[in-house]
Amino acid sequence: MSLVGRVGSLISQGVYSVATPFHPFGGAIDVIVVQQQDGSFRSTPWYVRFGKFQGVLKGAEKFVRISVNGTEADFHMYLDNSGEAYFIREVDPAANDTNNLISGSENNNGNQNNGVTYRLEHSLSDSGTGELREGFDPLSRLERTESDCNRRFYDFQDDPPSPTSEYGSARFDNLNVESYGDSQGSDSEVVLVSIDGHILTAPVSVAEQEAENLRLNTPQFHLAPGDGTEFCEGNTEFASSETPWDTEYIDKVEESSDTANIASDKVDAINDERNDLDSHSRDNAEKDSHDAERDLLGSCLEQSELTKTSENVKSEEPGPTFEDRNLKEGEFPLRTIMENDRSEDEVTIESIDTLVDSFESSTTQITIEEVKTTEGSRISVDSNADSECKDEQTSAETAILFNNQESSISVDSNADSECKDEQPRISAETAILINNQEGGIIESEDQDSERVSIDSTREEVDKDNEDRKTVVSVGVTSSVDEGEPDTDQRYELSLCKDELRQGMGLSAAAEVFDAHMISKEEYINSATSILESENLVVRIRETYMPWTKAARIVLGKAVFDLDLDIQPDDVISVEENESPKPKDDETTITPSSSGTRWRLWPIPFRRVKTVEHTGSNSSSEEDLFVDSEPGLQNSPETQSTTESRHESPRRQLVRTNVPTNEQIASLNLKDGQNMITFSFSTRVLGTQQVDAHIYRWRWDTKIVISDVDGTITKSDVLGQFMPFIGKDWTQSGVAKLFSAIKENGYQLLFLSARAIVQAYLTRNFLNNLKQDGKALPTGPVVISPDGLFPALYREVIRRAPHEFKIACLEDIRKLFPTDYNPFYAGFGNRDTDELSYRKLGIPKGKIFIINPKGEVATGHRIDVKKSYTSLHTLVNDMFPPTSLVEQEDYNPWNFWKLPIEEVE
């Protein structure tokens, strides 16, 4: 029993001496940073793994904090579902600059890839070639290699290895950031109005999309049936009809040749707010229906000239004419095709004189003039007898509300100067609203302009404004004033729940959200899988909510027009102890003079371009999010926000394991060894942490490489297990020899094909190794990227550790100048070690192979066998101090030694 007790104590002593904070599925590998001649830095990849079990953690917890020498860095890493840490870097796709990584670090010489994306994949194959390879795909797809053979430098999958390289340069994968604008697509159109799932659009060709403004002279508007049901079910971008739009809209007006649908005896009025308007509209509808029946094939669109001035409006100063606003005389014929039980009702406006206004940029101002009544106009309404407009909300949202169907409308462009101060803002999306609170269009002598604002709520008519006779709003999306908060909301979707965490900051959260934002094409192709994803997050202004929490708000808004409150518990709090700042596009409005509110759609439209056709193309483009929010005056802050949103689709984010030169410089590394800690906190597991070292070397450093298993230890397999039971299984004299080499100015590099999960054990084994009072000198411990079983399979069964070693050493060599070889000598225990060292250009005389008996052979010379102890006596000859200026070829050891005899 005493023997068993002693064995148990030895095992416990050995385990606790090397495995105090042991992570069975994770680890971090030492990093080498080389300072260049110009002061910049190059680094080996930072490979950190916490284990696959971390994949079940919440996205808000997957941020890895970095601490160097006890000081926390000002940047962090991300943690993926496999427990692997990585950096995200933004590159400029316009220049196709991926920073041309060398050994996973930035090429600080300023080299670019000149339009071609390069990546470091398998930096060495079996033959040991480790050149940069041209990427097969541009930075537009996610390239994440999961198999062992495709890992570069480290692989965290427990798969069998392949003959290809496993220690390559940094993984430099592209995060798929789709352009979420429509400006890069095919011919687009301008959304002018939306009525119950229908879209009023004007076509914009591809060539015209590059212009900042487009002017519509006499465009044809087609009101096509939209997919209202699908739109309400979650589409955040408005889908228009599938048919291509006619782009010849400048000088031509399409004549309607469709067969008119002859309606029955009665048509309900569009607006049922006034009974007299009800009956009046019904009588005119019946009359026009019989007129259309006599015409057989429908109505003919008549053109009339715009009334530029009004005889009854007195103004001291003439306002801007239509020529000043780049308008051409004409009218806007509208054809509305609405779907009702698979039958089409056609509403034709045959002669309306003034449904034309300025389609300038989103900052265009326009005065709403007085409305005049003209006799002789006619509006024909053809509708099925069964189609009745019973919904007050629907009638309130109708694009054109007719108040007197026996009238034509003229807009006076000569407005009083006082009206000019009340000009509402107009964007590319134009709604045409004609409303009369008294049941008809009445001539008014009032000089003040009246405005109608489109908002998400409809208010009652103010009693103070009942004396105002007419309200005409042409091209108004919203009125921008201050005083009333914006109540409308815009929803954006992204699959980033696993990467959002509490307190990460608004800018960091926005970066992560935009990196995984769902575009319209992605939603159309895979809407079901997106909605079922657990990582789906909805952004409402600056608020981030999981889809499970935001579904009630989005659906309530889309279906029932409800503005449900956002519960604080439902929100992912990404603010850094500060209240969220309101977005630039959150504006306030005041009630319009008429007191009546109109809204076109309860949820956002898709992105469209400002419409104004000019002779020259503008260098700047501006995209707008079109919705029912109040319009926004283009202040400098607003323009910068809009431009940044327009540029965001062009951003390219890449995944890499190498920090930038600026990030490395911010760490303030000291020469030699630096302690680095990687940690993240979870509510369940607490703080998880792995440690490693960063070694800062100069560009002219000389490196001596040493294998671990079989070279420092006595055998490959037993050397990994004997330290666990407290047994000394090391080669005698190794600590003293390596210490003497280090004292002469050389840096030691410990290279092992062990798995990454053994990084901590290997590092502590070497740090605790002492012989005759002499400790083994410190140096970076670089080990294999593979999992435990693939590493053992390659090391013990296949006997091919050189595959990893050659690739690893090649990448380290690339940290140094191209005309300088930093590797001076190498120690190993196998022929494969010699093969690896020869590939790196180490001469035969500096390659030392040791056998299990402790005998050291140089250059396979069997008759000249030494031990580590005997080599120590020659250390100053074989490893002369680096401070000496004497050339090594002429020192006593190399100059006077006997040449090797030639064997015939």
Swiss-Prot record:
Keywords: Cytoplasm, Hydrolase, Lipid biosynthesis, Lipid metabolism. Optimum pH is 6.5. One of its GO terms (biological process) is phospholipid biosynthetic process. Expressed in roots, leaves, stems, flowers, siliques, embryos and mature seeds. Residues 631-642 have a biased composition (Polar residues). Residues 1-112 are annotated as: N-LIP. Changing D709A: Loss of activity. Residues 703-857 are annotated as: C-LIP. A motif (DXDXT motif) lies at residues 707-711. One of its GO terms (molecular function) is phosphatidate phosphatase activity. Residues 254-293, 305-326, 440-470, 574-595, 612-655 are annotated as: Disordered. Disruption phenotype: No visible phenotype under normal growth conditions, but the double mutants pah1 and pah2-1 show reduced growth. Its cofactor is Mg(2+). Residues 265-293, 311-326, 449-470 have a biased composition (Basic and acidic residues). Belongs to the lipin family. Magnesium-dependent phosphatidate phosphatase which catalyzes the dephosphorylation of phosphatidate to yield diacylglycerol. Acts redundantly with PAH2 to repress phospholipid biosynthesis at the endoplasmic reticulum (ER). May function indirectly as repressor of multiple enzymes involved in phospholipid biosynthesis. Is involved in the pathway of galactolipid synthesis in the ER, which is required for the membrane lipid remodeling, an essential adaptation mechanism to cope with phosphate starvation. This is Phosphatidate phosphatase PAH1. It comes from Arabidopsis thaliana. The gene is PAH1.
